[in-house]
């Protein structure tokens, strides 16, 4: 990957200092009030000062479920990129990359050059960010297989790549993890041979000790903990048990019901480490959220948004945004990896069903022209376990929408999702964006005391199926709104205005100041980039499958 050009914002409101980037930024929005039958809209402006520390830390990542498909694939991806590996496949040689990562393969628009052309740079060039090749990995798993054996068991990567990675992954072995059988499917028992013994309080203390040991032995500045283990059943929120931080900590000490993922979340928060939940269960119960708020530690979740649901968050936004009334969404999946096997149990499937079904809620609620209060599309989600297909998940979707004058439109999609190869770059983005957010602080003219983002890090919503947000905040699932949120907040950190896509410079009758006008040319269809090539059946490439007929001669009589 080519290094990005250095970005320097030429503005009196921005200072690129040796320790931090400081930017004065005017946040413009609107406030709406209802007065009788009138909606009164009032534009507002708030002056912010953003400060982003430039020193990039040595960052460690601890994966819960390190030996699973996602954990072994992410570790392999970072090693393959660090070692610049290439390997043969039946379609030619491949080389390591970070495709699928917003931060490493996405771009942002800086603005227009003197000729009116848009200038794009890598997302990672906007602000100082940890290089993924510098990440240090550790983690836990209920299975004792080393990472090389776990990679082979996952059957995700080509054999040629596995062979090159084997000596680098063979020495990586997960630490023992927490296993509470009633929270995951019974079919996972065969893998559970690497367990932390003792009471819940003793298990919590061991997790904390593991985090401290990793930070110390690897010489790390920061550690982020990411849950990528099995989907658990939902944990009931019970007053007096897990509704407050105090009650949750007492519940752990008394050995009452608490899920393994919540144990890891609490341990991470107590150690000052951000915790991210990549599975659909309600790991971050109210007590865990309150603890994170008390300790000023970031938490995020829930459930990686990687394949079918990501498409759904785009397609339903398109349909409703186009004025079509989507009435039925039916989503069917089958997969054969361990995630699919675990989800074959009803309670674990229910956790997944909830996150996959809620992804269209905000889009429906945004359009009261189409949907009356309380009205929503029929939405059905089915997941089946088919061992033969392995990590190559099949997703089939049917969207039925009402058109004008009683018409209907049906879209049917088939999506083959390489489950772990889609999830791994999302895990990478979660870690890198969370760490970057830890270095951002801001204040306003009316509140000059510096503060950070809310502990519930909703800026990560782009990467989660069921994004957690601070109490009272709107939940946004529409994918491009989520991406714009990340991009525009980071633009604000360097004093750039939000990306509004207006391009008024190109919509004016007279030339825009500072943009060189071009000669007006007649509009015509774009030329075909490929020339017609004769086929073996005598047809040419642009003849729509038919033999090219000779041009008829017109009579002049």
Swiss-Prot record:
GO annotations of cellular component type: cytoplasm
Domain of life: Eukaryota
Post-translational modification: Phosphorylation at Ser-524 does not appear to affect enzyme activity, and is detected in brain and testis.
Entry's Gene Ontology BP terms: inositol biosynthetic process; negative regulation of inositol biosynthetic process; phospholipid biosynthetic process
Residue segments, region Disordered: 514-557
Location in the cell: Cytoplasm
Annotated control of activity: Inhibited by 2-deoxyglucitol 6-phosphate (dgtolP) and 2-deoxy-D-glucose 6-phosphate. Inhibited by copper, mercury, cadmium, zinc and copper ions. Activated by potassium and ammonium ions.
EC numbers for this chain: 5.5.1.4
GO molecular function ontology, one term from the record: inositol-3-phosphate synthase activity
Assigned keywords, A-Z: Cytoplasm, Inositol biosynthesis, Isomerase, Lipid biosynthesis, Lipid metabolism, NAD, Phospholipid biosynthesis, Phospholipid metabolism, Phosphoprotein
InterPro entries reported in the protein's UniProt record: Myo-inos-1-P_Synthase, Myo-inos-1-P_Synthase_GAPDH, NAD(P)-bd_dom_sf
Gene3D superfamilies: NAD(P)-binding Rossmann-like Domain
Main subcellular location: cytoplasm
Residues given in the record as NAD(+) binding sites: 67-70, 141, 177-178, 188, 191, 228-231, 278-279, 303, 306, 337-339, 352, 390-391, 419-420
Tissue: Expressed in testis, brain and epididymis (at protein level). Moderately expressed in brain, lung, liver, and kidney. Low expression in heart and spleen. Very low expression in skeletal muscle.
Cofactor: NAD(+)
pH-activity note: Optimum pH is 7.7.
Recorded catalytic activity of this chain's protein: D-glucose 6-phosphate = 1D-myo-inositol 3-phosphate
Biased composition, class Polar residues, residue ranges: 533-557
Modified residues (Phosphoserine): 279, 357, 524
Pathway where it operates: Polyol metabolism; myo-inositol biosynthesis; myo-inositol from D-glucose 6-phosphate: step 1/2
Assembly information from the UniProt record: Homotrimer.
Function (record text): Key enzyme in myo-inositol biosynthesis pathway that catalyzes the conversion of glucose 6-phosphate to 1-myo-inositol 1-phosphate in a NAD-dependent manner. Rate-limiting enzyme in the synthesis of all inositol-containing compounds.
Descriptive protein name: Inositol-3-phosphate synthase 1
